[in-house]
Amino acid sequence: MKISSIEYVVLEGLHPFVFIHTDEGITGIGECFRRQPLVTKTVVEELLTPALLGKDPVDTEARFRDMATAGQALEIGGAIWIGIAGLDIAMWDLKGKILNLPIYKLLGGKVRESVPVYASSMARNLTPLQEANRALSFVEKGYTGYKLHSAVPGKIDDSADQTIDTVTEVRKAVGDDIDILVDVNGAYSVHHAIEIGKQLEELGVFHFEEPRPHYDLPGLANVAEALDIPIASGEMI
């Protein structure tokens, strides 16, 4: 089996999908992250597709290396990895269809019957009270965890940050038995991240996500070493 063509389609102007077609008539479908979909389209069509055409999509590890090699001229992160991720998903979809197996079986099989989920707020324009009311609405629907996005990404230690006020209001609204997760998308210096983290510990926050920009791994390590709260990161790498 060989890859015969690749399509990149943006649905409703926001949702990018890739379709990998093969010479045996089987198609794999993958989804890309929605940020700057037209940039990703160029990467997929101009860089990644030539690296895949005519090759066996079932050899997913080799095809991943082909794509990574094709994208070496670009910096880590961004559109190159968004494109690679979507195409990798599509090739796994193909593999599952060919073998007539769900992907989880190809990745080692089922290890649990269910996975806990949390509600997530992507809005950063809510007042602390509005965020608290939103969190409560999800708790009333049965969620036992709520993740809020706060601070001002791209502006380190911005004075408009309301993280602590917001988490305080959310904790008051949902009580002590609900997990609160906080994601600031790299908006703090090391020193300020530690200050904020200690306050989040006092508020019983479940985890503190991306206190430092993704490229500052030493700084992230310093924050993690100074705090007891679990530090989450890695989605931007």
Question: Over which residues does each language-model region extend?
Answer:
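Structured beta-strand/loop patches that form or line metal/cofactor-binding pockets in enzymes
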Residues: M1-I29, F33
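Conserved, mostly hydrophobic/aromatic
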Residues: I3, G25, L48, L87, ...
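Metal- or metallocofactor-binding catalytic centers and their adjacent structured scaffolds
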Residues: H21-I98
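Residue-level marker for buried hydrophobic side chains located in beta-strands
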Residues: G28, I180-V182, I231-A232
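Glycine-rich, aromatic-flanked loop segments that form ligand/cofactor-binding clefts
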Residues: D88-R124
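Metal-dependent enolase-superfamily TIM-barrel catalytic cores that perform enediolate-based chemistry
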Residues: S114-L227
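Ligand/cofactor pocket segment of small-molecule handling proteins
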Residues: A226-M236
